[in-house]
Regions:
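Ordered, amphipathic secondary-structure segments that act as subunit-interaction surfaces
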Residues: 1-29
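C-terminal cap of thioredoxin/glutaredoxin-like
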Residues: 31, 35-140
Length: 140
């Protein structure tokens, strides 16, 4: 499976380096950091891209607070506030609620896209799958 994903990434300019990944981190803190970025007016998408790059390209431990804070500051977030966001636990309830909702929807991994709250697309799918799902959602 990793070879398939790595090959797909090459075509899209994403150099997956699965051999660099030494740990499967707990991502609760990372999700909390994304919520902080959303609420602080930062770019959650830039943060998410940086987190994915750190993990899948560099093999960094994105469960480590210092790593998360460095990544946050790299994308322009305030380091002190980012650290407080992940260490304080103030976003934990929201993260857990999101995880419960994901479980309710049958989400077991990423990527997973939910359209219109009703249609789930699991895994790396071709564009045609998304087009078909969007057409279906619009038609109903």
């Amino acid at each position: 499976m990793f070879a398939h994903v790595a090959n797909a990434g090459v075509g899209d300019g994403i150099p997956f380096q699965f051999d660099r990944i030494a740990t499967a981190p707990n991502t609760v803190r990372g999700h909390a950091l994304v919520l902080y970025a959303q609420q602080s007016g930062g770019s959650p998408w830039a943060l998410i891209e940086a987190l994915f790059s750190a993990y899948f390209e560099q093999g960094e431990d994105i469960g480590d607070v210092d790593t998360l804070v460095r990544i946050a500051t790299d994308v322009g977030l305030d380091g002190v506030e980012a650290r407080a966001a992940v260490e304080s636990g103030r976003f934990d309830v929201d993260v857990m609620q999101s995880q419960r909702e994901a479980a309710r929807l049958g989400i077991r991994g990423v990527p997973f896209v939910v359209l219109d709250g009703r249609y789930g697309i699991s895994g790396a799918q071709p564009v045609e799958v998304f087009e078909q799902a969007i057409r279906r959602a619009l038609a109903e």
